[in-house]
Amino acid sequence: MPIELIQVKRLEPGRVRAGFSQSPPRLHHAAYVVARERIAEARDELERRGLPAFLHATMGDLDSTLHDGAPVMGHHLELHADSRALHDFFAMVRNASAGWDGNDPLRSPGA
């Protein structure tokens, strides 16, 4: 399971800043990959259930949304539209973890 460490420098606009303002040590979010043809439906369903999106990011083939689930679940939900780029990214992360013994906590991909 990939674990993501976040060090925030600056967040804008306010709804994104609020979404990242949970006090540590808390789980920030759990992420799910959703079939591209069902991603809009999944996002709409979270909105209907009272988990509004506070960040929608796209870059090339990557398409992700963070939903505010903290009041209901204690953490946010991140939805990723399934794509080759997403699988390639997590393959890079998995490959970077090979042989990691914890002595160097921050490593560059390909290191």
Say what each PLM segment does.
Residues 1-52, 68-111:
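Glyoxalase I/VOC metalloenzyme domain signal
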Residues 59-63:
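Short acidic/glycine-enriched loop/turn segments that link adjacent beta-strands
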